[in-house]
Amino acid sequence: SIIINEERFEKELTPKGVKMPETWDDLLDPNYKDVFVWANPTTAGGAYIATACQIFRLGEDAAWDYLKTLDQNVHHYYKGAGDVISPVATGEFIASIAWAHDSFKIQQQGYPLKLIIPKQTAYEIGGSAIIKGGPNTENAKVFIDWLLTKEAQELSVATSYRYPVRTDVAAPAGLPTLEEVDLVDYDRDQAASMKEAVLEKFDAEIISNRA
């Protein structure tokens, strides 16, 4: 999601005629220069997914043009995907890109944080697994089975605001349902296979070229 500190936005950007962003392309507005932060895709998985999202959304050449233009607005890059939320929530910066569920959790604590889920957005599927040959395999199986119960899924929604995998468990209250989200055609296999090359290029052509 795009996250915005509403108080600073209304105080500093609204008077300039800037409208609340609705699309990925809205973040290219030069008015976001130095008030926008992001996580480094080479160190943050969530930022890589957002990077891959642009490639799937725009095609490779246009995506790199987009990322290089967006970089002109980036004050600096953080190491972790979640590291950007607090600086925006507290008003140190105005805007960023961050996981919706993590940002929503901070918003629920009373911060003036607005979440925008733009069209053609990406996603990740959280997973749990049993380690082959590990200790306590039977207990691990019991735990995995429990994770998939309605009780566990409702607990996950209530505490982490993550979307459930069960259709009989509702999405987090206050967030759109998955059916209401316009998802990009995100090819997970391609995202994995191109990751090394994309990150090398991001580091060489964007991170290494920053003043």
List each language-model region with its residue ranges.
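Extracytoplasmic ligand-binding site segments that recognize negatively charged/polar headgroups
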Residues: 1-92
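A bilobed periplasmic-binding-protein/Venus flytrap-type ligand-binding module shared by bacterial periplasmic
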Residues: 3-8, 51-52, 125-137, 155-156
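Short secondary-structure boundary segments
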Residues: 6, 40, 100-101, 159-160
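Periplasmic-binding protein-like
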Residues: 30-39, 66-71, 77-78, 108-134, 147-170
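Short amphipathic alpha-helical coupling segments at ligand-binding clamshell hinges
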Residues: 62, 66, 135-147, 155-158
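A ligand-binding cleft/hinge motif common to bilobed small-molecule-binding domains
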Residues: 89, 93-112
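Extracellular/periplasmic bilobal clamshell ligand-binding domains
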Residues: 173-211
